[in-house]
């Protein structure tokens, strides 16, 4: 009998009969391992627990303890959902798009035609059918089929036919079979439906097929799947909290911004309250950059297309750019997708000396990205954005010093915005796949070592990620945890050795020769104003610190006739001091007006009655506090100004 030889991660080699599946392999090691084994890998490709191991090679068992195992469970849960829908008569003729796992869950895109759309009211029936299939404990088996077989098998589902038709002619096509249900699948599932015990359907939303608005609108059914019910419950609770923090909901409730089809998808309109928050962020960041030696500029939002051909954006980034505008006579203008070529023009508009370096150029630069309709979300994914952008041109030997300077400024900004949950990622090129990166081995080795040394000098913890570098140089990414639990890149410092070559940037060195090449550092401290404001809205849950709050002081006279003049005088003094204050003139009960101020999350509410007018005092109620304080107005003004000046942190922080 023929045999196969399997090499395990610890280097051990075992021989098994040809035709063996991963399950007896796991059992040969231990029964407990077999019970925990979710799937297997041969040379990095998934092999189901009931599938034949096709050849000898490097072999690994995936258990419930492995991080990737939860993704396999969630992927299988999407298949379970589809199988359950097909068993319910009113959904029996449903068509299916794609059903992947995602962070914290899964979804499946479905199309049931004009009638019998899925609603949340259907979820109990669908979940009951899913649990029934779980009890059947159907083995999940993969097998390879021909293209002709696949087209015949899925002939009634136009979406599956489209997926099959898009595959290269020589692509292997595999299916996953569980009882009466068949899925197009490349592998990576649990052994049987009995493993998918703990799940919950959460929502249904519209989604264009393949994210294009010209394609049919499908229904995307979302769900959660975990190994334990307690984890499902925790995820549902987290999502309820997420709804309360969703910047789109808070933005609507607090009149911060809106989006509309009349204006255009992905083009948010900033209302006065939201514009005030954004303006405070912009003023803050400009002042911070000016204090750190940056020169602020304004550059056009439109540029000659040739600029982006020289930079390489047109070749590598064209799908994310809007079509060029033909101005006639061979001139084409392009909405810029990035600011760096414009800042290179600022550097290059006159000869530069080493004595001027580093030259730090910054801008709140408006950019445009051709985002698909299906990807657009509130402020966080838009088509027009303003980036807190900066570029430094530095001598190669001063690179490390400049990197540390940028990072120190960045951490100061995080402190002022009370951003504490983040980690640093040093992103290097992939040493096993160097051909996709800028071709200079010496540069890569030196620059990666410089970034690592700078982080060590600053005594900052970081992790290293090979293969995450940009093609033109290594970078530092700051990964922040959002209030909704996801991780995003907020800030970045990227080394660029390529664009200075493409644009032939030089400076005059100490030797008097104008042939020295600077290194370019791209850096973004808070990213785009849109995404950063969305982050702040969700982090603060709309209860902004005083310095950022759209309205800082709500003044409520007990009687507008008797106390209105004093209220207006207080407002005038606060506004003269640079504060944002408003006198409430509505005719309503005092309790209602105070509650409304608290609902609107205004940091300070002042109540003015006879005693306050007579004593030139104010009665102060701070947001989130039940107690009130009566104090001299001058003392209150000093307190709130100190609050603003200290970015609303405790004075001794």
From Swiss-Prot:
Keyword set includes rRNA-binding: no
Residues that bind Zn(2+): 340, 391, 522
Enzyme kind, highest EC tier: ligase
EC id: 6.1.1.3
Subcellular location, record wording: Cytoplasm
GO terms assigned for molecular function: ATP binding; catalytic activity, acting on a protein; metal ion binding; threonine-tRNA ligase activity; transferase activity; tRNA binding
One Pfam family hit: TGS
Cofactor: Zn(2+)
Assembly information from the UniProt record: Homodimer.
Protein's recorded name: Threonine--tRNA ligase
Organism: Leuconostoc citreum (strain KM20)
């Amino acid at each position: 009998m023929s045999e196969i030889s399997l090499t395990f991660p610890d280097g051990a080699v075992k021989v098994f009969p040809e035709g063996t599946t991963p399950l007896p392999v796991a059992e040969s090691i231990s029964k407990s391992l077999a019970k925990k084994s979710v799937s297997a890998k041969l040379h990095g490709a998934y092999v189901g627990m009931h599938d034949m191991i096709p050849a000898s090679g490097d072999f690994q068992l995936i258990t419930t303890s492995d991080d990737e195992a939860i993704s396999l469970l969630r992927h299988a849960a999407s298949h379970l959902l589809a199988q359950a829908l097909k068993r319910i008569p009113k959904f029996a003729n449903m068509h299916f798009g794609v059903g992947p796992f995602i962070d914290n869950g899964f979804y499946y895109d479905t199309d049931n035609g004009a009638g019998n759309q899925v609603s949340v009211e259907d979820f109990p029936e669908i979940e009951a059918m899913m649990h029934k299939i779980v009890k059947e404990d159907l083995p999940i088996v993969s097998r390879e089929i021909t293209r002709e077989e696949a087209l015949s098998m899925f002939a009634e589902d136009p979406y599956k036919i489209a997926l099959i038709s898009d595959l290269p002619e020589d692509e292997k096509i595999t299916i996953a079979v569980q009882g009466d249900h068949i899925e197009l699948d490349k592998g990576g599932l649990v052994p049987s439906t009995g493993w998918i015990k703990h799940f919950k359907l959460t929502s249904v939303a519209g989604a264009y097929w393949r994210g294009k608005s010209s394609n049919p609108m499908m229904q995307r059914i979302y769900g959660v799947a975990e190994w334990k019910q307690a984890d499902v419950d925790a995820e549902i609770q987290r999502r309820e909290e997420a709804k309360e923090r969703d910047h789109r909901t808070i933005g609507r409730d607090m009149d911060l911004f809106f989006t509309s089809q009349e204006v255009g998808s992905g083009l948010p309109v900033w209302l006065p309250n939201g514009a005030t928050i954004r303006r405070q962020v912009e003023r803050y960041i400009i002042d911070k950059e000016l204090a750190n030696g940056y020169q602020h500029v304004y550059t056009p939002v439109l540029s000659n297309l040739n600029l982006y051909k020289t930079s390489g954006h047109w070749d590598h980034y064209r799908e994310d750019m809007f079509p060029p505008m033909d101005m006639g006579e061979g001139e084409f203008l392009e909405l810029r997708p990035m600011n760096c070529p414009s800042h290179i023009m600022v550097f290059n508009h006159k000869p530069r000396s080493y004595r001027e370096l580093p030259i730090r150029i910054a801008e709140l630069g408006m950019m445009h990205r051709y985002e698909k309709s299906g990807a657009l979300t509130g402020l966080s994914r838009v088509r027009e954005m303003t980036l807190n952008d900066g570029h430094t041109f530095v001598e190669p030997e001063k690179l490390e010093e400049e990197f540390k300077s940028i990072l120190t400024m960045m951490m100061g900004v995080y402190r002022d915005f009370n951003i504490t949950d983040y980690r640093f990622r040093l992103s290097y090129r992939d040493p096993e796949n160097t051909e996709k990166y800028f071709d200079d081995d010496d540069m890569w080795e030196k620059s990666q070592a410089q970034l690592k040394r700078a982080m060590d000098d600053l005594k900052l913890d970081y992790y290293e990620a090979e293969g995450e570098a940009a093609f033109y140089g290594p970078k530092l990414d700051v990964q922040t945890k959002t209030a909704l639990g996801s991780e995003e890149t907020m800030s970045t410092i990227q080394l660029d050795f390529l664009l200075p070559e493409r644009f032939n940037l030089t400076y005059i060195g100490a030797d008097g020769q104008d042939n020295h090449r600077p290194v370019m550092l791209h850096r973004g401290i808070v990213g785009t104003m849109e995404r950063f404001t969305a982050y702040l809205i969700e982090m603060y849950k709309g209860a902004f610190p005083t310095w950022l709050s759209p309205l800082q002081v709500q003044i409520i006279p007990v009687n507008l006739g008797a106390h209105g003049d004093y209220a207006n005088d207080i407002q005038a003094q606060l506004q003269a001091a640079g504060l944002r204050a408003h006198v409430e003139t509505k005719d309503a009960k005092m309790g209602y007006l105070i509650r409304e101020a608290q609902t609107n999350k205004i940091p300070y509410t002042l109540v003015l009655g006879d005693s306050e007018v007579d004593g030139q005092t104010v009665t102060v109620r701070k947001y989130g506090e039940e107690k009130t304080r009566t104090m001299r107005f001058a003392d209150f003004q000093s307190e709130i100004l100190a609050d603003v000046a200290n970015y609303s942190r405790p004075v001794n922080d």
